[in-house]
C-alpha cells in the first residue's frame, strides 16, 4: 500500500499534526508514505521541511500569494492543482491511498482537485480517496469555522461577519455554496470516503450529503508528544496559588480565547497565577505570566505539566489536540460549553462548564479540579486520560479503514 497525505501546512496546526503523525507512524510500520504540503510561512518551504522524511512542498510561492490576494474578492481559491502528480500516482505499482486533510487556505482550486481525482480514478481504479474533515469548510459557502453561525443550513444567504476565517472584503458565499456542495457530491460519487475526528462536523456533513457519509475517527496525540509524556514526571500537587494555563496560537483572537473571561480571571488577583502560551498576548497584570509562543513541544509540555489546570474557551475548534495533550499529561481542562470541548472531555469522563463556574474552579487545587470536572481522583483521571487519547489507536483505525476499502 502506498499512502500520500495531503495538507496545506506541514507542521503548523492541528490538521497538520494529525496528517504528519499518520505519515510518520506509517513509515515506522514499514508502509510506503509521502506527505505533500502546500507551503510554509510566506509561501516558502516549511521551516520544518528538513526535519521529516518523504515530505514534498507542492505549491509555488506565487500561486499561494495570488490566492491570498484574490480570495478576499472571490471567496474561493482560483489557482492550484495536483496535475504534476498525475504520472507519479498512476505509474505507482499497487494500491494507492490519496488521503486529503485541509485543502483550502489559499492552496488549491476545489474544482481542479475533483477533476484530477476523476482523471486518476479512470486511469488507475485501485486508487482510494480518503478525506478527513478537520473543520466545517465542506458544508459552508466560504468559512472553515462556523463560530456559532448556522447560516449554512439555509444556503449561507447573508454572512454575519466578513472576518470569519478565511476573511473577505465582499460576501459571495451565497453564490458559491451550491456549486461547492456539488463538487463534494462528485467526490462522493468517485467513492471518496469522508472521515472526521468530531461528531458534530460529521453530523453537519451527513445532514447535507446523506446519513453515514462521514465516519468518526478521533484524533490522538502524536509520536513526539508520546515520547515527551514518557519522560514527564506526574505532578500531583503544586505549591502556592493555583497556576492556570491559557494556550492559543494568537491570544488576541476572541474566537479561540474568550477575552472577557481571561480578564475576569485576571481580576481574581492574587487568588490565582495566570500563565499564557501564545503570540500577541494582550493580557498584562501582576498575576499574569506571558510565556509567548512556544515552538518546542517538549518545553510547552514541561511547562503545562506544572499547571493546576488549562482553561479552554474556544468557539472555533473541532477536535482540539491541545486538550488531548494536556489531559494526557494529567492536567485537568476547564472548558466552557462547546461541541468540540464536550466531545473531547467526554472521552475521559469530563464535562464542560459555564463561564461563571470557570471563575470558581480556577481557585481550587489540582485534585479538587479533577474531582469537580471528571468526578474522580487526580491519579485515576490521569490514568484514564493517558489511555483515552492514544495516537497509535488512531493509526490502527486509519490503516484498518484503508485496508477495508
Curated annotation (Swiss-Prot):
Spell out the CDD domains in the cross-references.
GT4_WcaC-like
Quote the protein name from its UniProt record: Putative colanic acid biosynthesis glycosyl transferase WcaC
Q: In which pathway does it act?
A: Slime biogenesis; slime polysaccharide biosynthesis
Taxonomic source organism? Escherichia coli (strain K12)
PANTHER family on file: COLANIC ACID BIOSYNTHESIS GLYCOSYL TRANSFERASE WCAC-RELATED (PTHR12526:SF632), GLYCOSYLTRANSFERASE (PTHR12526)
Q: Which GO terms describe its biological process?
A: colanic acid biosynthetic process; lipopolysaccharide biosynthetic process; slime layer polysaccharide biosynthetic process
Q: Which Gene3D superfamilies does UniProt cross-reference here?
A: Glycogen Phosphorylase B
Keywords linked to the UniProt accession? Lipopolysaccharide biosynthesis, Transferase
Is Hydrolase set as a keyword in this record? no
Q: Looking at the record's lineage, which domain of life comes first?
A: Bacteria
Q: A single Gene Ontology molecular function, please? A: UDP-galactosyltransferase activity
Amino acid at each position: 500500500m502506498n499512502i500520500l497525505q495531503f495538507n496545506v501546512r506541514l507542521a503548523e496546526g492541528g490538521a497538520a499534526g494529525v496528517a504528519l503523525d499518520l505519515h510518520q507512524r506509517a513509515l515506522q510500520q514499514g508502509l510506503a508514505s509521502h506527505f505533500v504540503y502546500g507551503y510554509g510561512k510566506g509561501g516558502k518551504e516549511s521551516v520544518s521541511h528538513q526535519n521529516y522524511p518523504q515530505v514534498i512542498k507542492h505549491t509555488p510561492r506565487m500561486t499561494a500569494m495570488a490566492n491570498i490576494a484574490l480570495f478576499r474578492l472571490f471567496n474561493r481559491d482560483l489557482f492550484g492543482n495536483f496535475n504534476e502528480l498525475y504520472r507519479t500516482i498512476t505509474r505507482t505499482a499497487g494500491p494507492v491511498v490519496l488521503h486529503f486533510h485541509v485543502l483550502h487556505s489559499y492552496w488549491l482550486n476545489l474544482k481542479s482537485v475533483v477533476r484530477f481525482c476523476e482523471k486518476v480514478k479512470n486511469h488507475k481504479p485501485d486508487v482510494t480517496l480518503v478525506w478527513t474533515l478537520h473543520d466545517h469548510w465542506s458544508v459552508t459557502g466560504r468559512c472553515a469555522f462556523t463560530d456559532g453561525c448556522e447560516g449554512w443550513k439555509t444556503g449561507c444567504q447573508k454572512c454575519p461577519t466578513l472576518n470569519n476565517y478565511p476573511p473577505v472584503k465582499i460576501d459571495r458565499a451565497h453564490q458559491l455554496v451550491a456549486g461547492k456542495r456539488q463538487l463534494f457530491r462528485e467526490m462522493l460519487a468517485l467513492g471518496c470516503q469522508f472521515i472526521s475526528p468530531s461528531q458534530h462536523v460529521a453530523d453537519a456533513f451527513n445532514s447535507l450529503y446523506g446519513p453515514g457519509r462521514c465516519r468518526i475517527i478521533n484524533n490522538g496525540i502524536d509520536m513526539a508528544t508520546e515520547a515527551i509524556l514518557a519522560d514527564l514526571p506526574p505532578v500531583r500537587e503544586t505549591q502556592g496559588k493555583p497556576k492556570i494555563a491559557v494556550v492559543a496560537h494568537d491570544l488576541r483572537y476572541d474566537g479561540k480565547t474568550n477575552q472577557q473571561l481571561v480578564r475576569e480571571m485576571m481580576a481574581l488577583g492574587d487568588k490565582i497565577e495566570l500563565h499564557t502560551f501564545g503570540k500577541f498576548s494582550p493580557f498584562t497584570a501582576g498575576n499574569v505570566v506571558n510565556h509567548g509562543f512556544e515552538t518546542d513541544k517538549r518545553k510547552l509540555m514541561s511547562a503545562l505539566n506544572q499547571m493546576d489546570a488549562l482553561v479552554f474557551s474556544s468557539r472555533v475548534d473541532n477536535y482540539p489536540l491541545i486538550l488531548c495533550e494536556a489531559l494526557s499529561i494529567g492536567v485537568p481542562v476547564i472548558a466552557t460549553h462547546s461541541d468540540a470541548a464536550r466531545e473531547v472531555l467526554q472521552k475521559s469522563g469530563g464535562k464542560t462548564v459555564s463561564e461563571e463556574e470557570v471563575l470558581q474552579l480556577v481557585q481550587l487545587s489540582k485534585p479538587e479540579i479533577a474531582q469537580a470536572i471528571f468526578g474522580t481522583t487526580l491519579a485515576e483521571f490521569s490514568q484514564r486520560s493517558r489511555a483515552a487519547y492514544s495516537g497509535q489507536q488512531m493509526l490502527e483505525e486509519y490503516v484498518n479503514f484503508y485496508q477495508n476499502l
